[in-house]
Every structure is written in C-alpha cells, then in structure tokens.
Amino acid sequence: MILNILLTLTLLMGRVKSDPDPLQDYCVSPPPSSHQQIFLNGKLCKDPTQASVSDFSTSALSRPGNTKTKPFMINVTVTTTANLPGLNTVGLTMARLDFGGSGVVPPHVHPRASEVTVCLDGVLLVGFVDTSGRVFTQELHPGETFVFPKGLIHFLYNIDTVSSALAVSGLSSQNPGTQIVSLSSFISKPPFLVEVLKSAYDINGQDVARIRKSLEG
C-alpha cells in the first residue's frame, strides 16, 4: 500500500509544473474587451487568425531604466502580456536589470521559476543559498552567465560603487512571482506581529520599528 502511494505521488509530482504545457501553437493575449471570445481552457486568447508578428516582439527591454529614483538603486523591466502579447502561455519571462552604483537586487525568491542571468556590462556579485544554508556566490563579468534554482533565496549586487551595470535574466514561468525577504517580513500587509519578528530575528521592538521605517522609505 505504501509503495503504491509513493509511486502515485512520484508520478503526480513529475507532472506538476509552474506553467502547463500549451495545447496549441500560441495563445496571444488580446487587448481587454467585454466581447472577447474564449479559445482555450477558460483563458482569453486572441483569435489565432488575427495574430500578427507584432504580437511576438517588443522593444520593452531596449530602454535603459532609471535607477536613481528606485529603492536599492536597481530598475527591473519585465516582459508581460501587456508589452509582449505572444508571451501568454509560453512559460517564459525576460527581465532587464539596470544597476546604479552599488545597486542591489536584495535577497529574494521566485516561487514559481528558475532564473538564468547574463551580465552584459559591469561586474556583478551574484549568489544563492540552498536549503542546507550553503551559499554559492560568483563574480559575473560581461558575457558570463549564472543560474538560480527555483524557489531559492538569491541576490545580485553591482560591486562598483560608481559605475552602472546591466544584466538580462530569463525565468521559467510566465508568472514567476517575486518575494523580497526583508520587505515580506517587515512591511507585509497586514504586518507581522512585532513579537514574531522580535523572536525570529533576535531584535527588540525599537529595532522592528526602525527597520520598518527604513524599508518603507
């Protein structure tokens, strides 16, 4: 009986994916409309006969992002079905990461996707920590690539305090999700109980208030 249950679970887990396999060539996301027809599984798709080449291309990642007004001196530009309609159901996301001097993508997770990053300009310190607490870090120079396993805490940091840096990432889900550890812990809505944060991080109530104020800007 136990063997049968384990075999069943193994088979089921092998079928679990962040994004389901598409059942057609493409499912271009249409502009919002109250008269939209449904072509697949309850999901909105443009009539395939109306799809055009512009649905499958975008210049969204060609424009540099402004890092000076952004928290952590980092600007992330992401492809979505709004700027790349043909992205719908293909199970991918692309992101442009512009770093200011000492810019950082703080420790965060993508619960539904693995990520591969290519450094295009500057030098980045990148890394992740596995579930045993082991840390893997590497300096990335232009043209070098690093992969972050799905669901693990990871970061990217521009080691130059003055010059900018640039990277492009690909993620294995149309909706990878992002949780920045510090923000999720200290400025969630509604907030965590102060007692929970005090115990979890071995800090006092004043520390909690100070950290929250700092993260909220």
Curated annotation (Swiss-Prot):
Disulfide bonds: C27-C45
Gene Ontology terms: cellular component: apoplast
Glycosylated position list: N75
Subcellular localization, as worded in the UniProt entry: Secreted, Extracellular space, Apoplast
Residue span, Cupin type-1 domain: 59-209
Alphabetic keyword roster: Apoplast, Disulfide bond, Glycoprotein, Manganese, Metal-binding, Secreted, Signal
Binding site residues for Mn(2+): H108, H110, E115, H154
GO molecular function, one term: manganese ion binding
Signal peptide, first to last residue: 1-18
Pfam families: Cupin_1
Entry-linked PROSITE patterns: GERMIN
CDD domains the record matches: cupin_OxOx (cd02241)
Primary location: secreted
Function: May play a role in plant defense. Probably has no oxalate oxidase activity even if the active site is conserved.
Family classification: Belongs to the germin family.
Subunit record text: Oligomer (believed to be a pentamer but probably hexamer).
Protein name, as recorded: Germin-like protein subfamily 1 member 1
Gene name as annotated: GLP7
